[in-house]
């Protein structure tokens, strides 16, 4: 399945505007992949809907983030899912990508793990008083502005739709999914 997903992903990235049948094939393959993971593990991640709760526990999230600087924030990702309804795995993977797994200067010095308010490398960003505050603020902002139909940046509830306003990079959603894949590999 990984090989099929990678092949479809490459085809999509090579096109300026994804062709419907390629995306449809990718979605079918990805659905089989997610079902396979769910069969062996109750943790859920749906890249087409970040409002679907993961059901991840704090200990599972710690295991998923093991070996990274984000491991101490595992309970915060779970809390954010319960409070704001944003999938904890998706939120953690955004933090993993945006902060280089918690090692970036912004993460360490500015408590900005999610790229919140950062629109260029020079941008100051919207920093928080603590690491936990940044994660909770981002979850609240995603829930309110990106994942609800009356939200200012709403284009849909999936990573690709969030990508439109969250990041200037058109490959952002794919990179976030790659982080998710790494997290699930840690869980097995």
Label each PLM-derived region with a short phrase.
Residues 1-35:
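Extended amphipathic alpha-helical heptad-repeat regions
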Residues 21, 25-90, 96-188:
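Catalytic cores of secreted/periplasmic lytic hydrolases that degrade extracellular macromolecules
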């Amino acid at each position: 399945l990984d090989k099929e997903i990678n092949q479809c992903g490459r085809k999509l990235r090579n096109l300026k505007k994804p062709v419907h049948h390629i995306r449809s094939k990718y979605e079918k393959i990805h659905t089989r992949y997610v079902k396979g993971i769910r069969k062996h593990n109750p943790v859920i991640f749906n890249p087409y809907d970040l409002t679907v709760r993961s059901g991840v526990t704090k200990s599972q999230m710690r295991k998923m983030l093991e070996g990274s600087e984000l491991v101490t924030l595992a309970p915060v990702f779970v809390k954010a899912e319960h409070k704001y309804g944003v999938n904890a795995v998706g939120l953690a993977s955004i933090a993993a990508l945006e902060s280089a797994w918690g090692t970036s200067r912004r993460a360490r010095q500015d408590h900005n793990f999610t790229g919140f308010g950062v629109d260029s490398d020079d941008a100051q960003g919207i920093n928080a008083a603590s690491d936990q505050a940044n994660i909770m603020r981002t979850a609240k902002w995603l829930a309110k502005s990106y994942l609800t139909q009356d939200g200012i940046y709403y284009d849909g509830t999936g990573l690709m739709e969030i990508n439109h306003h969250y990041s200037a990079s058109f490959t952002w959603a794919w990179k976030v999914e790659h982080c998710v894949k790494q997290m699930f590999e840690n869980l097995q």
